[in-house]
Amino acid sequence: MTSKAPLGLVLCAGLSKRLGSAKALVEVGGVPLVVWACRHLLDAGCAAVVVVTNEQLRSNLGALPNGVQVVTNPEPENGRTGSLQVGLNHLLSQFPVLKRVVMAPVDRPGWRAGVVRTLVAKTGSSCPVFEGRRGHPVVLDNEALQSVLNAPSDASLRDLVDFQAVEVDAPWLSLNIDTPEQLSELRRNEEALLAYFTQGEGI
């Protein structure tokens, strides 16, 4: 089966050592970030969404949107590219030809469906940019996907893929949830972030 629509991956297999708690379960408006990411990808038109997590977190993810699949990375310590490879291999079991995949790390939540739509309207691999700063999610085309699949699991994605920078209207794009201080920043801005998530998104 081949999908003309993009496919989505949410990466949340990291061990969250610096934050001290699971990033995927951080809530905005009472909804975990992993759920927000899945919703945004589905609203953007992704034909399938897969969450890549670790064994410990898998049983604590709770209810995800209908149709979202979950796969476990047995070696999350190998980093983001390893998790991306786990997700891609899972997608390959259902879609033998991967044309375009949207990859969203759960700890970079400052985007919504409109950002994905803008990215997939371009050809090739792309990443969003707001006020000169690049962010996530990113879109990988078939050539980039092959590079990722053939790379060591600890390789840096920026060394594997040449992303086209695409301007987007995403004031929260640089938001990162990696440390307690960054989580505190999210809490201070939670109401505004929730308004951004839900404005015009049909949620």
Language model feature labels by segment:
Residues 2-4, 146, 150-203:
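Conserved alpha/beta core of the MobA/IspD/sugar-nucleotide pyrophosphorylase nucleotidyltransferase superfamily
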Residues 2-134, 164-170:
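Nucleotide and nucleotide-moiety/phosphate-recognizing core
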Residues 16, 26, 145-146, 184:
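Nucleotide phosphate-binding site architecture
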Residues 85-88, 142, 180-185:
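Short, surface-exposed amphipathic charged segments that create phosphate/polyanion-binding patches used
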Residues 104, 137, 175:
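Glycine- and other small-residue-rich loops at beta-strand/loop junctions that grip anionic moieties
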Residues 110, 139, 176-177:
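Short aromatic/basic micro-patch
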Residues 133-135, 140, 156, 172:
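A conserved catalytic-core signature of glycosyltransferases
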Residues 135-146, 180:
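Conserved nucleotide-sugar donor-binding
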